[in-house]
Regions:
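Conserved nucleotide-sensing/catalytic segment adjacent to the nucleotide-binding pocket
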Residues: 2-59
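Short, charged, surface-exposed secondary-structure boundary motifs
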Residues: 11-15, 64-70, 131-133
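Short, hinge-like loop/turn segments at secondary-structure boundaries
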Residues: 17-22, 73-75, 139-140
Length: 144
């Protein structure tokens, strides 16, 4: 699993150039098997064109805010074990609250344009996400 933040920031958490960010994603999606976690709307066409499956996580904004609070308590606002630095500010909170209204329609348009070949799963609850994880886990165990 590649977190987009790992590609977007250097080791000192400085933003890399857009060209470097896009090139890093092209390198990842050129691989045979990959999972990318993150939104990165401007570079979504790169990932969408190469993906066979796209999972759009779209829980209610209050669920997202609760998750942000819990992560903040768990990691103290710093870097969690996965290496992603927790950045919470007013701009980020506004983005989360307005995501469904402002960003999601753009994401869905990009997917319509660039991911017609892919299976797109639009999950709107933790329950549906957990169900998918169980189904994938069961399918993986069935192939072993």
């Amino acid at each position: 699993v590649i977190h987009l933040d790992e590609l977007r920031y250097d080791a000192s958490w400085n933003v890399v150039s857009e060209e470097e960010f896009f090139a890093a994603q092209r390198k990842v999606v050129a691989g045979a098997r990959w999972v990318v976690d993150g939104n990165g709307s401007a570079s979504l066409p790169i990932r969408a064109a190469a993906a066979d499956t796209i999972i759009v996580l779209d829980p209610h904004p209050l669920v997202c805010l609760a998750g942000i609070i819990l992560r903040g308590l768990r990691y103290g606002g710093g870097q969690h074990p996965g290496g992603v630095y927790v950045r919470v500010n007013c701009e980020f909170l506004h983005y989360v609250v307005s995501y469904r209204r402002k960003t999601l329609p753009k994401v869905l348009r990009v997917l319509d344009e660039h991911a017609g070949h892919a299976t797109v799963l639009h999950l709107t609850s933790r329950r549906s996400a957990n169900r998918l994880i169980r189904e994938l886990d069961d399918a993986e165990r069935g192939h072993q």
